[in-house]
């Protein structure tokens, strides 16, 4: 039982570390979107006389913005499902340990009642000593399981909060990327119109 409880504690720690990594990845995604937005805003301020290299960067950003949000969204959803499944498995394992402990306590109480009812002639002190030792061990196990239960409840709550925040951030990122693509489309259309107008003016000359 001790080895299994230690494993549950270790799994809970691993889960918390994964949630932290998950949050860091979301923060990185937000930073990337912010940089992308600033670059597009800077390009917009340049005007119709945008250098050729900025036009190439616009095309690259447009292509990247089409692929990155969808791929990252799929990855985040997969990670959330995995974490939720892992939480469920750990919680079921904890419930099994609690049930096993309750079963042990039930058998112990039954044996003690039988011992008292039968009045087996045995030295009093050894019986009391064994009773104290066994009770102490059970109390330690109960305390550890309570600690594990609290840790698991906190981990599950943290997982649910993180999942909600990540979904909200991803939705915001998708909206921002959609707006960026619209801006890029307008800028490209403006560049094409300006180019055609310049060619037309040149041909008239």
Curated annotation (Swiss-Prot):
Localization per Swiss-Prot or TrEMBL: Cytoplasm
Role summary: Suppressor of IKK-epsilon. Associates with the striatin-interacting phosphatase and kinase (STRIPAK) core complex, forming the extended (SIKE1:SLMAP)STRIPAK complex. The (SIKE1:SLMAP)STRIPAK complex dephosphorylates STK3 leading to the inhibition of Hippo signaling and the control of cell growth.
Disulfide bond sites: none
Claim: Zinc is one of the keywords in the record: no
SUBUNIT field: Interacts with IKBKE and TBK1 via its coiled coil region. Interaction with TBK1 is disrupted upon viral infection or TLR3 stimulation. Interacts with CDC42BPB. Associates with the STRIPAK core complex composed of PP2A catalytic and scaffolding subunits, the striatins (PP2A regulatory subunits), the striatin-associated proteins MOB4, STRIP1 and STRIP2, PDCD10 and members of the STE20 kinases, such as STK24 and STK26.
Full protein name: Suppressor of IKBKE 1
Gene Ontology CC annotation, any one: cytoplasm
Keywords on record: Coiled coil, Cytoplasm
InterPro entries: SIKE
Coiled coil: 4-32, 154-192
GO molecular function, one term: protein-macromolecule adaptor activity
GO biological process: negative regulation of hippo signaling
Lineage, uppermost ranks: Eukaryota, Metazoa, Chordata, Craniata, Vertebrata
Xref: Pfam families: SIKE
Family membership: Belongs to the SIKE family.
